[in-house]
Amino acid sequence: MTLRVRFLAEFTLSRKTRFFALLRMTCEGLGMTEREYFQVKKRTAVYPGTFDPVSNGHLDLMKRGLRIFDKLIVAVALNPTKNPLFNIEERVYFIREAVKVWKNVEVESFDNLLIDYVKEKKADVIIKGLRAVSDFEHELQMSLMNRRLDTHIETVFMMPSEEYSFLSSKVLKEVAFLKGDIRGMVPTVVVKGLKRKFKNKKIK
């Protein structure tokens, strides 16, 4: 009996019976048992960063990451050594506001070793963005260290879309401080946040 004939015959069955019939046919096509089908691991990726502040370039990578992975965790690093403009609560808030209508995205902060955080979240991939060749050397070094610490966790490098390839949080803050127009480069909530931060600051 051909697959088409089997499908037409089984389509007339009750909804519950039809579901299991189609499941059985799917599993046969994949060469696995029904138990194995439901035990296929959903992949979770962690996208870490300081995000001071989040830009549309960051959001672009998040969207593309969701095309590849079932779940994305945006991990905002506390990282006090970088002396961020926005505190950790503000940075997390900005991202949550920007992605609030998205599915399968979590946003939270972390202050421990990245590889330990990834294991805590039961993720198996780290996403890192590369704007330029100059970023690659540092990120490669970090990915090799992470692999040394845990060989089961992979790092995926992603290039930003061309329209965002020039963006960096540092440049955006400088432009905002000098009263430049950053609309279209950061989420609206960040535009408002930067205006508040620099409202009473004078250019020296």
Task: Describe every region a protein language model picked out.
Residues 1-11, 15-18, 23-36:
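A cross-taxon signal for low-complexity, glycine/charged-rich
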Residues 32-204:
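Nucleotidyltransferase catalytic core that binds NTPs
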